[in-house]
Structures are given as C-alpha cells and as structure tokens.
Amino acid sequence: VHMSNTQVSRITQIGIYLGKHWRLFINERGWKVLIFGAVISALVSIVLGSGMFVYTMDTFSGGFALISACIWVGIFNSIQNICKERAIIKREHRAGLHISSYIASHLIFQAGICLLQAAILLGISSAFLTYPSCAPLFGGVWLEYFITYFLCIYAADVLGLAISAIVK
C-alpha cells in the first residue's frame, strides 16, 4: 500500500488493509485454515463420539478436547501473519502507515475468519455429537456453544498475532 505525502486517516488505512488481507486470503490460499479447522473438528468429534454429554467425565474430557481444538485452530490462523510481512510493514510505516491501523485490520479480519471457523466447528461437531437440549444463558444451545467456540478461537488467534509480532 502506497501512502503519499498527504496523511491518510487511520480508518481509511484499516479499510485498505482489510482489502489487502482479503486478497492475500484468496490469492495465497489462506482459506486452507478453514479446511484445517474442519479436519480438526471432524477428527476430535469422531474420537469423542455421541456419548460426550451423557456422562460427567466424558463431558469434561470432551469439553477439554474441543476447547483444545479451538486453541490450536486459532493459533494456527495467525501465528505467521505479521512476521512474514515484517519488511513490508517497516517500509510502509516509514511511508505513513499507522501500526494501530494495521493491527486493527488484522483483528477485524481474523474475527471474521474465527466466526467462520466457529460455525464450521459447531456444524461438524453437531453431526457427531448430541448436544444438550437445555441452554441456561441465552435460551439456545447452539448460540451458547457458537459464542464459546468463537471466543476461544479468537483469543487463541489474537495470541498467535501477538507471538507473530514479537518473533523476528
């Protein structure tokens, strides 16, 4: 992204970088992370079986396995995002890039990816697992599990971005 001498607002830069992230996602086969999430979801769900929510210990073990899958999927989404573009980011920063805009664009784009992965995880796991019918918080068990999966995947994704920003 070329920044001229005129100052480009942070919001405009976020939009520019969201477009860049989308192009990279499509052209560099970033969509493979969705397939990776689907494969991990299927493997974990097959191993857990349909009795996961029947017995307490199976529920604990299954919950741990599903959340572990969320963490792995989230970290692998973003672990290399920043470090592979380090030279480009430095050059663009000298040309006027606000680092906060760059990070915000990554956070927004990765949130969208994490929403898709949470939906994939819930959809695939529901084919193999029998989720409970009662939902104490929001009245819908699907919504509760979707929010839980999304928050776990997104937290791990942000951790991956932080690691990527630190590593040279």
Residue ranges and their predicted role:
Residues V1-K168:
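Membrane-embedded and extracytoplasmic architecture of multi-pass membrane proteins
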